[in-house]
From Swiss-Prot:
Name of this protein: RING finger and SPRY domain-containing protein 1
Zn-finger region bounds: RING-type: 527-562
One Pfam family this sequence matches: zf-C3HC4_3
Organism: Pongo abelii (Sumatran orangutan)
Sequence positions bearing Phosphoserine: 50
Length: 576
């Protein structure tokens, strides 16, 4: 929800300000006046009342008064056609620009309040984005993120990702300058070990850039010094949160095949084998490190002779789990199918394997990270729009509990609840009563009033479901082990009634799944949509015949020519 609303605002705001600037120029020409003009709203503001220490205006005045053009263009806007955007939000009081550190901390303070797509981004986010439109400003923003984001704030790394993801792409010169400023190597990783926030933030920045610049730019960014720095951060002497984000950064660098080969040659798998033993550690920071280490060993940095986790995990008592075939593309799911984590910049979602249509049902979630997650119930009609920021609770077919922002979500609208913010180790309970048509949410056994809005759109076909913001993780209990806070009323559990075959329980690593896809052969006469059934149906009046009858019955227009389908004729009979 946050990312999509922020992107829409920037697009509309840039267009509106360009039109207003053009209008001002024509008015000034018509009246025969010059100089600064005053406008209202969130467009350009008058220089006379914008503050004498406005650094952007000062730079522009110096450039205009200079008789000799400067050869250094790093402080100039990257898009000279687009007018400068100096507007504040329409409700923001006029004030002098703060320093970058203050703006970053302001953004961190208000990030929990950004909940709706039509909500104005705060002044701090707008200003930071404007600063980052030049190389010099972008470098200032990045250094500030490393310098001031505190270790203890659970949304700190997510704010780093959010701000960098929405800033303009850095130029090659800016990236080169950043590597020179940071000057990272193994020795730097050992410095300031008593202040791990700087190293955590540095790794988070590197990971975000690696994800955003996958390809040649990512290869150039992973210098020998940066690789040495990240590997040094994985040593057991490091703070667990530093280890976690160094590992995530290496994962994101490995999205580029050349980087993956370089990292694999560093014997990283030997270090990860030690760290994967933390996957069930009672310390929730170490547990995150263990989860990511195990996932990397299974999916990215394979170790010769090591058995993949899915081949040895005991699933005999598990009859319901997270569905690896009903999940957005970047969510990580554990081999036992009951734990999930998101390290992408998108809003990743998943449903479980079991659907309920009647009765009273209950499941629990253990909070591993205390950031933004929307967990609850969803039908098959609920859509996963991860890149647009929509997840569970963001349509009329789902309802979700958000313990970080203390909200209940339904149909992309939120309302506050009275529970305190959740924290690591908390247990959230989810009760679905289809007899009374109500949902009840619990935090450590304390229940909220029932929620009934979703039943105006649907009354059956519910799955347990969840959506995750960046760097969030939780564990699900569908009844395979005793609940910590079972409700007083009689209920059923997924694990008592669900059934999965041994094959359906397997959650394959991505390289194994890709290998299976490469082995799939598609017949010449198969349906062009499902690639499963024989293409035996002709559409009228257009005459196209590349579909099976099952797919043709679901269409109103031909997918090839877009003509309306009047009738469907089966051409041949076949044995499926």
């Amino acid at each position: 929800m946050i990312v999509f609303g922020w992107a829409v605002f920037l697009a509309s705001r840039s267009l509106g300000q360009g039109l207003l600037l053009t209008l001002e120029e024509h008015i000034a020409h018509f009246l025969g006046t010059g100089g600064a003009t005053t406008t209202m709203g969130n467009s350009c503001i008058c220089r006379d009342d914008s503050g004498t220490d406005d650094s952007v205006d000062t730079q522009q005045q110096q450039a205009e008064n200079s008789a000799v053009p400067t050869a250094d263009t790093r402080s100039q806007p990257r898009d000279p056609v687009r007018p400068p955007r100096r507007g504040r939000g329409p409700h923001e009081p006029r004030r002098k620009k703060q320093n970058v550190d203050g703006l970053v901390l302001d953004t961190l303070a208000v990030i929990r309040t950004l909940v709706d797509n039509d909500q104005e981004p705060p002044y701090s986010m707008i200003t930071l984005h404007e600063m980052a439109e030049t190389d010099e400003g972008w470098l200032d923003v990045v250094q500030s993120l490393i310098r001031v984001i505190p270790l203890e704030d659970p949304l700190g790394p997510a704010v780093i990702t959010l701000l960098l993801d929405e800033c303009p792409l850095p130029t090659k010169d800016a990236l080169q300058k950043l590597t020179e400023i940071l000057n990272l190597n193994g020795e730097v990783a050992c410095q300031d070990s008593s202040h791990p926030a700087k190293h955590r933030n540095t790794s988070a920045v590197l990971g975000c850039l690696a994800e955003k610049l996958a390809g040649p730019a990512s290869i150039g960014l992973l210098s020998p010094g940066i690789l040495e720095y990240l590997l040094q951060c994985l040593k057991l002497q490091s703070h667990p949160t530093v280890m976690l984000f160094a590992l995530i950064a290496l994962e994101k660098f490995a999205q580029t095949s050349e980087n993956k080969l370089t990292i694999s040659e560093s014997s990283i798998s030997d270090r990860l084998v030690t760290l994967e033993s933390w996957a069930n550690d009672p310390d929730y920071l170490k547990r995150q490190v263990g989860f990511c280490a195990q996932w990397s060993l299974d999916n990215l940095f394979l170790k010769e002779g090591r058995q993949l986790t899915y081949e040895k995990v005991n699933l005999s008592s598990i009859r319901a789990m997270l569905n690896s075939n009903d999940v957005s593309e970047y969510l990580k799911i554990s081999p036992h199918g009951l734990e999930a984590r998101c390290d992408a910049s998108s809003f990743e979602s998943v449903r479980c394997t079991f659907c309920v249509d009647a009765g009273v049902w209950y499941y629990e979630v253990t909070v591993v990270t205390s950031g933004v997650m929307q967990i609850g119930w969803a039908t098959r009609d609920s859509k996963f729009l991860n890149h647009e920021g929509y997840g569970i609770g963001d349509d009329e077919y789902s309802c979700a509990y958000d313990g970080c922002r203390q909200l209940i979500w339904y149909n992309a609208r939120s309302k506050p609840h009275i529970h305190p913010c959740w924290k690591e180790g908390d247990t959230v309970g989810f009760l679905l009563d289809l007899n009374e048509k109500q949902m009840i949410f619990f935090l450590n056994g304390n229940q909220l009033p029932p929620e009934k809005q979703v039943f105006s759109s649907t009354v059956s076909g519910f799955f347990a479901a969840a959506s995750f913001m960046s760097y969030q993780q939780c564990e699900f209990n569908f009844g395979a082990k005793p609940f910590k806070y079972p409700p007083s009323m009689k209920f059923s559990t997924f694990n008592d009634y669900a059934f999965l075959t041994a094959e359906e329980k397997i959650i394959l690593p991505r390289h194994r799944r890709l290998a299976l896809l490469k082995q799939v052969s598609i017949r010449e006469n198969c349906c062009s949509l499902c690639c499963d059934e024989v293409a035996d149906t002709q559409l009228k009046p257009c005459g196209h015949s590349d579909l099976c009858m099952d797919c043709a019955l679901q269409l109103e227009t031909c997918p090839l020519c877009r003509k309306e389908i009047v009738s469907r004729i089966r051409q041949i009979s076949h044995i499926s």
